[in-house]
């Protein structure tokens, strides 16, 4: 395709800590089992350097899975948060979404290691102060 849009759902993930835009790219990996058993955090950052970047990342955080991800065990794992995040910068959008998630469940940025690893690889930035962020409350 000429362009593609990455549309993940914000949720907790046992191994990666979070499934957002970067982790969503695991859907294009043939052998996900290998990635999940060989430094998953680094693999998530690495895949962002190999694939054609999405023209837009749209994170659906309307209902988010706060525990027992990626599948969940019950409705109690899900919370109505009414959030939506969009950016061309995959690291920035995942950073913002993680900060949002942290309001629902303790999940500091440092625990989602693939964010810093991707920033080191120059995939994007975790420094949200560098960006022109527009917040809309509905």
Where do the language-model regions lie?
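Extended, low-polarity segments enriched in aliphatic/aromatic residues
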Residues: 1-138
């Amino acid at each position: 395709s000429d362009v593609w849009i990455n549309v993940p759902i914000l949720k907790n993930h046992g191994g990666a800590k979070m499934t957002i835009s970067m982790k969503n790219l695991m859907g294009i990996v043939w052998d996900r089992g290998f990635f999940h058993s060989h430094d998953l955090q680094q693999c998530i950052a690495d895949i962002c350097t190999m694939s054609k970047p999405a023209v837009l990342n749209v994170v659906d955080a309307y209902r988010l899975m706060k525990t027992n991800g990626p599948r969940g065990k019950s409705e109690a794992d899900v919370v109505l948060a009414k959030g939506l995040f969009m950016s061309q910068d995959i690291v920035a959008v995942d950073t913002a979404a993680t900060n949002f998630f942290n309001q629902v469940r303790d999940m500091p940025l440092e625990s989602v290691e693939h964010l810093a690893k991707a920033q080191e690889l120059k995939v994007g930035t975790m420094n949200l102060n560098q960006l022109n962020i527009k917040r809309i409350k509905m």
